Amino acid sequence: MGREFDQLFDQWALTYDDTVYGTDEQYKEVFSNYEEILDEVAKLSLGSVLEFGVGTGNLTKRLLNREHKVIGIEPSKEMRKIAKQKLPHLQIMEGDFLAYPKISEPIETIVSTYAFHHLTDEEKQTAIKRYANMLSTGNKIVFADTMFVSDQAKQEMIDQAKINQFHRLAEDLQTEYYTTLPILEEFFQLENFTVHFTKKNPFVWILEAVKK
């Protein structure tokens, strides 16, 4: 994963929480049911958790409240700063989905919300292979992110964003690496996971992959 988005996230850090809680009209549907989505990801998690893309710590707080041990990985310096202000005892390290410090302790769940789309499909597959090697039978990967049932469905959402004059959203959908459910399902099945998808809003699905 390139670090081309780091500057964007440093700039976004101070207003990120406002965006996810619905103050940005263009992203209102993307972040609809936000708290419910975070709650469900936390509920699906088991044991020791490795979280990629901690952001400002909104999911992390829920995981800690459920008494999970959490190791957080976050590329943005400003996001890490805000997360540490919210959660002073959080173990959070600089890194991303593909480049992160060595994790020496056993991990039972790997989680991420609104972030896996920063990887190309090739990078996604590489990441999933690595994570599969970290997990034992019954362990999980739980991701919530924008994804689509097909390329056609993705194009329809881009077209609708343009009709609504949501130009930032349309550009985002065209320039980030949002993928499809069949592609993700194949990547996980190749690494011996069973996969289940749950739709949470017009954009976001929760992916739960359990290691066989």
Residue ranges of model-derived segments:
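A conserved beta-strand element that flanks and buttresses the S-adenosyl-L-methionine
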Residues: 111
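C-terminal alpha-helical "lid/dimerization" subdomain adjacent to the S-adenosyl-L-methionine
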Residues: 144-191, 196-198
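Short catalytic micro-motifs in class I SAM-dependent methyltransferases
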Residues: 114-115
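Short amphipathic alpha-helix with an adjacent loop that forms part of the alpha/beta core around
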Residues: 99-105
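A short glycine-rich, Lys/Arg-flanked "PGG" loop and its adjoining helix->strand segment in the class I
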Residues: 125-137
